[in-house]
From Swiss-Prot:
Name listed for the protein in its UniProt record: DnaJ homolog subfamily C member 12
Biased composition (Basic and acidic residues): 114-156
Gene name tied to this protein: DNAJC12
InterPro entries given in the database record: DnaJ_domain (IPR001623), J_dom_sf (IPR036869), JDP1-like (IPR029827)
Disease: Hyperphenylalaninemia, mild, non-BH4-deficient: An autosomal recessive disorder characterized by increased serum phenylalanine, normal BH4 metabolism, and highly variable neurologic defects, including movement abnormalities and intellectual disability.
Induction profile: Up-regulated by ER stress.
Superkingdom of origin organism: Eukaryota
Alphabetized Pfam families for the sequence: DnaJ
GO CC terms, sorted: cytoplasm
Tissue specificity note: Expressed at high levels in brain, heart, and testis, and at reduced levels in kidney and stomach.
Subunit and partners: Interacts with HSPA8. Interacts with TPH1. Interacts with TPH2.
Modification N-acetylmethionine occurs at: 1
Amino acid sequence: MDAILNYRSEDTEDYYTLLGCDELSSVEQILAEFKVRALECHPDKHPENPKAVETFQKLQKAKEILTNEESRARYDHWRRSQMSMPFQQWEALNDSVKTSMHWVVRGKKDLMLEESDKTHTTKMENEECNEQRERKKEELASTAEKTEQKEPKPLEKSVSPQNSDSSGFADVNGWHLRFRWSKDAPSELLRKFRNYEI
């Protein structure tokens, strides 16, 4: 209880400050900052400094907590709640105890930039897809108009009206003449389809 009452936040407890990162930093940024700091204060480079080992261990612990999604979420919750106890002690508490503590938690920092690169590239890809769809619709409309112009007019019945049995037969045979495949050069749309460009 005395530890909680006499608790003072130390800079070593703030893992983001220790690594020189921000709470919005990605895992890659955290790892890059860790490597830089670890090279600066590695115990092998400073054997005469007794605090080098302690500092390096703190850096490793900060890296382990901040690169793991679950532990980072717990750390961020603890940090924003401004609990007056060390993070290790907070971690040791049972989940039921944590939920019974009704502390107001500050919200996460807002992003300085509105969109990330991924969001921007996704929007650009969607716009390109929409443009391609519009082009395809226009091509389909133009090819449909061309086929309507080329399509022969329906054949008149070549069978005399006297022979009623053969008129049905003539319609069946004439069907393929009305809806036959065009022997013209394939359209641009058909070429793209065959080459898997669509």
